[in-house]
Amino acid sequence: MPKVISLQTSFNSGVLDPRLASRTDLKHFYQGAEEATNVITMPQGGVKRRPGFKYVATINAEARLASFAFNVEQTYLMVFTNLSVAIYKDGVHQADVTTPYTTAQLFELQWTQSADTMILVHEDHAPRKLVRGGSHSSWTLSTITLSNVPQFDFGSGAEDVWSGTRGYPKSATFYQSRLWFGGSLQRPQTIWGSKTNDFFNFDDGTSLDDEGIDVTLDTDQVNAITAVYAGRHLNIFTTGGEFSIQDSPITPAKVAVRRETLFGSTSIPPKMIDGSVIFIDRTGKSVREFLFSYNEDAYTSGTVSLLASHLLNSPVDMDVSKGTSSDDANYLYFVNGDGTMAVFNTLRAQEVSGWTKWETTGEIESVSVVVDEVYVIVKRTIDSSVVRYLEQLDVDSYTDAN
């Protein structure tokens, strides 16, 4: 019999799930791969070897990473560890600041930023602000003084809705000149908006347009809020579904919460990329894009991990690197519970999307992107000792920091 040789000129679909091994009826079959480890798929169709992870610093404890960007030139990497945060600029240590967040709370911590101030929230702690001073090494963390805290009757008369007993906000975002808090220990379905341009004042007064907002989701079951996110609209992610508030502007008299989809999400904060908000659904096995449809005047939550769902293994962290030019793809990095990383590239305008797997001789535990620089925390075994390194993806490095 003659031998049939097929020519494959594109790998845009990346790694394909083993269950698709015989799906010759799919176009992805002809631009995918059975395995693609430690490579990067390019929107033009090719693949290239991923850069190495360059050593930056030794971290002496479990850590979680976050980015802080005042502008494209003044950017910082935050390394949260037990009761402390270390601040780096361009890979150089600048300062250490004491925090109240324990190791067990690090991956429950959420934040949002406005100019030189980062708002930090956790349901066990009063909201705090991390403020950059006049130099790269000048930082201050303090408890936010909130005025006119919303009141609620928990059964013994009206009291502050947030307290050490009742819990504090677990998510936050800035939207339409208000600071929004989402969910707390004993008010898991409620969102609160500050007064307009008065971020720490939640006075609802007489419900004038610029006054505070207090809204509880109207659902048939308790869907605890996992994140509030400023996307095209104010998006609300919960354990049981996804919601939006599309009013413009949102006021106490005009705030309609719309239930959009019913997938639910984990506590990993969502990310905006390529016109959609990416979130991990409550199963921890699917990545979905919360995308507004003009035709339906509603949001959809299609899965973007269907073709390579086997690369996801209980994700614990994620971040996004946005393309810097019109022909460069966007990349999403998902840190798995087993220490590997699933990398998704997307360029919607060119119908490009694909997954690859990254691994190293160690376990990747956290990821953060500072502008276009990718940083990770890696747990490695060096000379029989377990260490944790802060490492940076570096195009000039051909090996990892072993």
Model feature map: region roles:
Residues 1-93, 129, 133-233, 240, ...:
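N-terminal beta-propeller domains
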Residues 57-62, 101-105, 160-169, 261-263, ...:
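Surface-exposed ligand/attachment interfaces on beta-rich extracellular proteins
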Residues 84-158, 340-395:
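Beta-strand-rich solenoidal segments
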Residues 109-111, 178, 216-402:
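Beta-sheet-dominated scaffold domains
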